[in-house]
Amino acid sequence: MIAFPNAKINLGLHVIARRSDGYHDIETIFCPIDLCDILEIVSATQTKFIQSGIPMDCKVSNNLVMKAYQLLKKHYNLPEITIHLRKNIPIGAGLGGGSSDASFMLYLLSNLANLCLSIEELEAYAKQLGSDCPFFIRNKPVFAKGIGNIFTPIELDLKKYNLALVTTNIHISTSEAYTNIVVSHTPRESLTDIIHYPVDKWKNRLVNDFEEDIFPLYPEIREIKQELYNQGAIYASMSGSGSSVYGLFKKPYRPIGTFNFSIHNFI
C-alpha cells in the first residue's frame, strides 16, 4: 500500500501567551499543499524501516512513522511490515512533513489490517503522536489554536493561486524558535477575519510573529521573502517557525530570472 503524505503551510501565526507547562498558545491557519512525501508499507516477515530522499538525522525508533506503527500495535494485532519512506518535504522547515507522515501511516495501517478505524478514531490516535498530526487526517483548511491542536474548519479556496515555495539548508527547531519569542499583548485583528479579506490585502495584515525574531538571526530568510515580492507575489510569508518561505501568485505563474523555488498548488 502506498500513500502520499502532503505538506501544509501556515497562513499567519500569532503567539498569544506563554503557558505554565512551558508551551505557548498560538493562533494560525493550516492549509494543505501538494508537496508530498511517499510512504509505502508491505507485509513482511520482520518489521523494517527504509528511508530515502532527504536525509533524516534521527533514530528509527524516534521517527513518527515508526511511532505510529508502535502505537497501533499496542491495541491491534498488526502484521510485520516493511516501511519505505521517501522524504521530499524538507525537515525543520515549518511544513509539517513528519506529522503528515505519521497521520498517513495510521491510514495505511488501518487499511492494511482491516481495522476500519473511523475518522474520529484516527484523529484520537494522531493526537497522541503530535499536536498538529490530527490536522492531516481530514486535510482541510482549519483555524488552529491552543498549542496548535484545537481546530475549527474554515472555508478557504486558494486554488486560483500558485504557491512558490523556497526551502533553505537552515534547520530551525520548534524549541529554538520559541526560546526567544516575545509575546505581544497588543490587541490586533483576528486571523479568521483577515483570512477573508482579498489576498492582495493580506500583506502587513496576515503576520507570522516568528519572523520578527528569526529574520535577524537568519537574514537570508528575510531576503527570500523580499525577493518573492520582487517577483510579483501578492503575499509572502515564512511558514510556521521556519525556515521555508512561500509566496502566492495568480495562476498561471511563470518565474522571472533564475530565482530558485518550486511551484505548488493548494489541495
UniProtKB/Swiss-Prot annotation:
The keyword Kinase applies. InterPro entries: GHMP_kinase_C_dom, GHMP_kinase_C_sf, GHMP_kinase_N_dom, IspE, Ribosomal_Su5_D2-typ_SF, Ribsml_uS5_D2-typ_fold_subgr. It comes from the Bacteria. The keyword Transferase applies. It catalyses: 4-CDP-2-C-methyl-D-erythritol + ATP = 4-CDP-2-C-methyl-D-erythritol 2-phosphate + ADP + H(+). GO terms for biological process: isopentenyl diphosphate biosynthetic process, methylerythritol 4-phosphate pathway; terpenoid biosynthetic process. Pathway: Isoprenoid biosynthesis; isopentenyl diphosphate biosynthesis via DXP pathway; isopentenyl diphosphate from 1-deoxy-D-xylulose 5-phosphate: step 3/6. ATP binds at residues 90-100. It is an enzyme of class 2 (transferase). Pfam families: GHMP_kinases_C, GHMP_kinases_N. Keywords: ATP-binding, Isoprene biosynthesis, Kinase, Nucleotide-binding, Transferase. Belongs to the GHMP kinase family. IspE subfamily. This is 4-diphosphocytidyl-2-C-methyl-D-erythritol kinase. The lineage of its organism: Bacteria, Pseudomonadati, Bacteroidota, Bacteroidia, Bacteroidales.
